[in-house]
């Protein structure tokens, strides 16, 4: 009743009580154009019915001849609503049989009784523009009735439908996995659910013109479907991340009504709550930091042996979670006693604007708000970067920035408290530029090649551990142990899920008992100090690592430090001579990028490097290893305007003078002079290229290789050792000796 109080939105508003469903429907008869009937024997028709209801102002009702059913009370009796759409035959028999031609379409059956109703909807509503593809709903169909006790009773999430019906959204309950049949229909062909979902997402992308993002409410209902709980082969979080990876590829995000806490009621009403134009938050000044003993008089971070701590107060990336936990967390009487960085998605303003408004109006000076994962909606931003796996669509970064900016401006946000990368690539330099445009005071991604970096003026800190111990003392011990493991950087981030202010107060008290050098900060102080600290310690000749202000490289030592900042932007400002260079570990050269854990590994070089027309000279390496080269393994990188002279690369396989294995990389105006790349240390066949190792989805343009040697036992090339069909070599030439040891004497001038 908060909003019924004097001065509040619902003060003195009239309330009408209806005693029966018949009375309620009769009262709103002017808004209801009829009924769409669904068939519980084909559970997916229940979701299709909700989608049709929104598109045509109908009520979705289950066909049921029982005298107390809604069908009997509202169609056969009471207001006698007209049946306008049927997902069941008039005689009550099943319409969708999983064979022949799908009724009402020209398409053959998918072979899946579950999927055919969705194809019917695609043909009759999505392709005809009758639905609003800016909204979608991922909620359980009637299959939940087979095991209603799998989790809390209200996780049927029927109460969540009203908002999405009001938005004319499309509905679905489909598996994101392409390596097993959907667990709710094990006889279907593998990948059928996934194919239908991709078709829906692509249509949404096309109708939204790639400019608007699709807002999906819901979450994989892993207690019921698509995981090991339901007889599948995948665990819970992997299923969450695979769905996330999939929708992100098509410019969609989710408002994550996750399992057990996923129910939400009356959002169609609360969406009309009047928000203020702006909810501002102040940023800390350097003078304030000096007064608090955090900065010295000359503006440097005054560490004094301290470790600075921030808690990610989550997970508030779902309207249902924010709504259900307000009374347990926000209304805790101990809120305000310690600094708390509340991570709440601004896109929740769509369904629970009244809750977000209440937070801002009742916040204390110790309550500060940042965006939760991963901005204005939960998606994998690495899937917005080109090339985009799954969809092959153009970059979605610009449209993501345009989606997030107004949300951040409205709510006074400048920090993205956590970026869940999941199964997606980490942010490359273009992804970093995207976030810098709307989250200038900080981001915390899972995947980062170093613990921290400064991108432009944006501090970037790698996410660390989740700390969710029930007992505050146990949590404090875990925090202290982790901080002591991580020597060096005195800034520490920990994620907590649905913890009360009382828990935080008690954790801080326990920390003081164990180690009083640990200092919990408010979010502005933490990220501003981190920014200053990173400026003080950056090992380059200048710059901040962004495209317009790249890190400046003037010595071999600075060039070697690129490996700690692999996602950023660099420019060479003079020639580099590696004749006498020895790395800090006393070893010979090692490539800047490494293979790492495989696809999308953060150990790969994914930055932007502008050689400025200068040269790298006399770099040499001879090791029994793969991907030996200057830059090593690259992915999503760009290297331009560089000369390489008199360099020697001798190793095992995937060798190149400039790069080893080269993924989704652009190389332009790079000249290799009098250098050698030789595969002489391998015990089996391998490859080498005068410029790069094998190319995958990459482009080389206006490059040359002159003089020198290329030698390999398997594949050898004057430019690259090999390339897949998605790569291009444009306006390049090589004049070098290329030796392919089919026979010891074979050699070719290429």
Where are these regions (language model features)?
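Preference for solvent-exposed, low-hydrophobicity sequence contexts
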Residues: 1-268
């Amino acid at each position: 009743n908060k909003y019924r109080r004097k001065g509040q939105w619902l003060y003195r508003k009239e309330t009408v009580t209806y005693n029966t469903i018949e009375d309620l429907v009769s009262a709103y008869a002017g808004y209801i154009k009829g009924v769409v009937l669904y068939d519980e024997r084909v559970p997916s028709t229940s979701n299709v019915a909700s989608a049709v209801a929104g598109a045509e102002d109908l009520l979705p009702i289950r066909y049921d001849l029982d005298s107390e059913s809604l069908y009997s009370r509202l169609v056969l009796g009471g207001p006698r609503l007209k049946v306008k759409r049927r997902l069941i035959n008039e005689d009550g028999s099943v319409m969708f049989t999983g064979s022949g031609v799908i009724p009402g379409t020209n398409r053959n059956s998918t072979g899946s009784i579950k999927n055919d109703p969705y194809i019917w909807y695609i043909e009759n509503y999505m392709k005809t523009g009758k639905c609003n593809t800016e909204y979608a709903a991922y909620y359980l169909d009637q299959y939940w009735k087979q095991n209603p006790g799998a989790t809390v009773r209200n996780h049927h999430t029927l109460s969540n439908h009203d908002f999405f019906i009001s938005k004319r959204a499309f509905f679905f309950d489909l598996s994101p996995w392409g390596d097993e049949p959907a667990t709710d229909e094990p006889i279907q062909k593998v990948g059928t659910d996934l194919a239908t979902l991709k078709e829906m997402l692509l249509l949404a992308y096309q109708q939204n013109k790639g400019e608007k993002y699709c807002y999906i409410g819901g979450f994989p209902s892993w207690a019921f479907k698509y995981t090991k709980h339901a007889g599948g082969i995948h665990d819970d979080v992997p299923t969450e991340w695979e769905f996330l990876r999939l929708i992100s590829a098509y410019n969609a995000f989710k408002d994550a009504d996750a399992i057990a806490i996923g129910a939400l009621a009356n959002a169609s009403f609360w969406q009309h709550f009047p928000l203020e134009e702006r909810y501002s938050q102040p940023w800390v000044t350097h003078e304030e930091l000096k007064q608090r003993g955090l900065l010295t008089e000359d503006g440097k971070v005054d560490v004094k042996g301290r470790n600075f701590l921030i808690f990610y107060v989550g997970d508030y990336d779902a309207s249902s979670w924010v709504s259900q936990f307000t009374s347990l967390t926000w209304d805790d009487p101990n809120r305000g006693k310690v600094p708390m960085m509340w991570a709440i998605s601004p896109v929740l303003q769509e369904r629970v604007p009244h809750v977000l408004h209440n937070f801002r109006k009742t916040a204390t000076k110790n309550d500060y708000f940042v965006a939760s994962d991963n901005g204005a909606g939960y998606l994998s931003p690495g899937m917005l970067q080109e090339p985009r796996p799954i969809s092959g669509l153009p970059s979605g970064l610009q449209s993501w920035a345009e989606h997030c900016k107004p949300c951040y401006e409205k709510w006074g946000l400048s920090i993205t408290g956590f970026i869940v990368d999941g199964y997606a690539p980490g942010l490359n330099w273009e992804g970093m530029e995207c976030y810098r445009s709307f989250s200038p005071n900080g981001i915390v991604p899972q995947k980062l090649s170093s613990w921290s970096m400064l991108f432009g003026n944006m501090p970037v800190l790698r996410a660390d551990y989740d700390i969710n111990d029930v007992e505050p003392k146990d949590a404090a011990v875990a925090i202290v142990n982790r901080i002591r493991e991580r020597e060096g950087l005195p800034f520490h981030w920990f994620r907590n899920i649905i913890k009360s202010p009382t828990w935080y107060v008690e954790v801080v008290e326990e920390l003081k008992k164990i180690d009083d050098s640990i200092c919990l900060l408010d979010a502005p102080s933490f990220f501003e100090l981190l920014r200053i600290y990173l400026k003080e310690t950056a090992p380059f000749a200048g710059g901040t690592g962004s495209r317009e202000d790249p890190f400046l490289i003037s010595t071999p030592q600075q060039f070697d430090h690129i490996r700690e900042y692999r996602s950023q932007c660099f420019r060479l400002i003079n020639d580099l001579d590696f004749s006498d260079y020895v790395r800090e570990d006393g070893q010979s050269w090692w490539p800047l990028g490494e293979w790492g854990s495989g696809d999308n590994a953060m150990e790969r070089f994914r930055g932007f490097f502008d050689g400025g027309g200068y040269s790298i000279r006399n770099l040499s390496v001879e090791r029994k290893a793969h991907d030996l080269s200057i830059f090593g393994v690259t992915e999503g990188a760009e290297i331009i305007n560089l000369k390489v002279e008199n360099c020697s690369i001798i190793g095992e396989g995937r060798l190149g003078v400039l790069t080893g294995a080269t993924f989704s990389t652009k190389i332009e105006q790079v000249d290799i002079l009098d250098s050698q790349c030789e595969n002489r240390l391998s015990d089996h066949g391998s490859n080498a290229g005068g410029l790069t190792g094998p190319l995958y989805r990459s482009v080389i343009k206006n490059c040359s290789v002159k003089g020198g040697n290329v030698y390999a036992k398997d594949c050898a090339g004057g430019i690259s050792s090999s390339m897949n069909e998605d790569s291009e070599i444009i306006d390049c030439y090589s004049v070098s000796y290329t030796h392919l040891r089919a026979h010891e004497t074979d050699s070719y001038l290429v």
